[in-house]
Amino acid sequence: MLLNDLIQRQQTRWKASFLVVSILMVATCILSLSIGEMWILPWSPDGALEQQLLTQLRMPRLIAALAIGASLAASGAVLQVLLGNPLAEPGVLGISGGASLALVILLFALPFVPTPLLTMLAAMLGALIFTLILVGLSRRRKVSTARLLLIGVALGILSGSVVTWAFYFSDDLNLRQLMYWLMGSVGGVSWQQLSVLLFVVPVLVWLCLQGKKLDLLMLGEIQAKQLGLDVAALRWRFILIVSLLVGASVALGGVIGFVGLVIPHLLRMSLGAENRYLLPLSALCGGLLLALADTLSRVILPSAELPVGVVTTTIGAPIFVWMLLRSHID
């Protein structure tokens, strides 16, 4: 009876968290659509100008922020299980850097502006290559947590330096303006660019429903196989899905760090490690955090707009340092 009560209490906590996060997300969405240089009531815009600002600027960037935040948070939660590393995250491990590197190479290689689908495929390929490197090292070499983080940071620095050199030697103003975008920004996202969400949303929903399989994977590879799980196929499927989500996120909003690290880790600490609840709640919280960060980036400075990646890094970096100290990594 005591065990049943404990399980029931834990499920109640998860359900209450879903409810609270959903309410906060609705409030944040209304605030994000309303606030700016011109205050607009989303349900009753006054005039053609307010209508255009709402539908062509604020709504696309809000949808992009929600999708990117959800994708990065869910990807971070999956990576932490796949790598057996509570500090794994697409930005910290350099996966986002690989996506941005592939995207910049594509922009330099093509004589025309690539379509949103082509940019997503290029970013996905870069993310996939870096993910395979990290997964291969973590499984075959059995590197420690500290060394894996260092390898990821090194890969991120390497890709970042190549991107910086490329922009420095570029005479194209549009390419140089991309440097601001690569710092993380959903400003200027159009409805055409959001067409990639036709691929991203179904994949994200599928990923959020794989929590039970991840719970089995956390028991260990041998135990998971004994319970009928095809571990190798599932691992490859997760790698491809994470690469697609990270690649699409970078293609839409540039490199936005720490969302995939902070959200899953804090949820595990406060609510537990049941992935069937953790994955969808991480996605919701990730979307909420990035929508809130994007709203703050527009109002912190009166005459300028900060990249949303700067806001998330400001929030996430101190938490990351605290997590490193807490895990006693030498």
From Swiss-Prot:
Membrane topology of the entry: Multi-pass membrane protein
Q: Indicate the principal place this protein occupies in or around the cell.
A: membrane
Q: Show the GO cellular component annotation of the record.
A: plasma membrane
In its keyword annotation, does this UniProt entry include DNA damage? no
- Any idea where this protein resides? Cell inner membrane
Signal peptide extent: none
Which Gene3D superfamilies does its entry note? Answer: ABC transporter involved in vitamin B12 uptake, BtuC
- Segments spanning the bilayer are 20-42, 62-84, 91-113, 117-136, 148-170, 190-209, 240-262, 277-299, 306-325
Q: Which domain of life is it from?
A: Bacteria
GO MF terms on file?
vitamin transmembrane transporter activity
**Biological processes per GO annotation:** cobalamin transport
Disulfide-bonded cysteine pairs: these are none
Q: Which Pfam families match?
A: FecCD (PF01032)
Which keywords does this chain's UniProt record carry? Cell inner membrane, Cell membrane, Membrane, Transmembrane, Transmembrane helix, Transport
Q: Which CDD domains match?
A: TM_ABC_iron-siderophores_like (cd06550)
Protein role: Part of the ABC transporter complex BtuCDF involved in vitamin B12 import. Involved in the translocation of the substrate across the membrane.
Annotated family: Belongs to the binding-protein-dependent transport system permease family. FecCD subfamily.
Q: Which NCBIfam families match?
A: PRK03784.1
The annotated subunit structure for this chain is:
The complex is composed of two ATP-binding proteins (BtuD), two transmembrane proteins (BtuC) and a solute-binding protein (BtuF).
Name-wise, this protein is Vitamin B12 import system permease protein BtuC
- From which lineage does this chain's organism come? Bacteria, Pseudomonadati, Pseudomonadota, Gammaproteobacteria, Vibrionales
Could you tell me the gene encoding this protein?
Answer: btuC
